[in-house]
């Protein structure tokens, strides 16, 4: 019993430390990061994600910086009834490129790697339905991801203990594709 308690305490002490070791994009620039992104791939240990990952499609993020140093993010997700939309405020936490999103249960969001013009890798530590989980998302400025972007993503997510079977490359969808919509 004592060894179980010791193991549980060590696990609790270790988890926040391991989570906090995820580095940020050096000299993150919110202005350069703003604009349209496609979510082209994800990896996660979230049980809800794992149950739905084979039925997901690419979604979009339209991002703009806020005066407070955060990000306003407009998300569009393909659904059975068309394109679902959600707006969220990414609140700055300490360093540039580090956020939390209380409305979505995102306790920790970090821009890990980006070249601003073609890709970004995001780390998300979240709570969903009472369970904590880790997610990594690969953003691309186009629906066709570059080899450099894919390599950065594939090199990063396993360092968090996420195996390949927890990753999905998302198929393209016209439901939320701004390029397929007619101009107003």
From Swiss-Prot:
Subcellular location field: Secreted
Main location: secreted
Keyword entries, A-Z: Disulfide bond, Secreted, Signal
Classification via InterPro entries: Calycin, Lipocalin, Lipocalin_CS, Lipocln_cytosolic_FA-bd_dom
SUPFAM superfamilies: Lipocalins
Record carries keyword Cell membrane: no
GO cellular component annotations of the record: extracellular region
Cysteines engaged in disulfide bonds, as pairs: 83-176
Molecular-function GO term, any one: small molecule binding
Pfam families xref list: Lipocalin
Signal peptide: 1-20
Similarity section: Belongs to the calycin superfamily. Lipocalin family.
Annotated PANTHER family: LIPOCALIN (PTHR11430), LIPOCALIN-15 (PTHR11430:SF64)
Name of the molecule in the record: Lipocalin-15
Source organism: Homo sapiens
């Amino acid at each position: 019993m004592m060894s179980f308690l010791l193991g549980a305490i060590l696990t609790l002490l270790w988890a926040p430390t391991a989570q906090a070791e995820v580095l940020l994009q050096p000299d993150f620039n919110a202005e350069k990061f703003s604009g349209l992104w496609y979510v082209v791939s994800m990896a996660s240990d979230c049980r809800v994600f794992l149950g739905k990952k084979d039925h997901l499609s690419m979604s979009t993020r339209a991002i703009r910086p806020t005066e407070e140093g955060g990000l306003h993010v407009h998300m569009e997700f393909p659904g059975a009834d068309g394109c679902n939309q959600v707006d969220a405020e990414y609140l700055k936490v300490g360093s540039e490129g580090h956020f939390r999103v209380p409305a979505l249960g995102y306790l920790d969001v970090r821009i890990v790697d980006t070249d601003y013009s073609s890709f970004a890798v995001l780390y998300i530590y979240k709570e969903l339905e009472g369970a904590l989980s880790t997610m990594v998302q690969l953003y691309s400025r186009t629906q066709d991801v570059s080899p450099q972007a894919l390599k950065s993503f594939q090199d990063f997510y396993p360092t968090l203990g996420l195996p390949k079977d927890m990753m999905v490359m998302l198929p393209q969808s016209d439901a939320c594709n701004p390029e397929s919509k007619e101009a107003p």
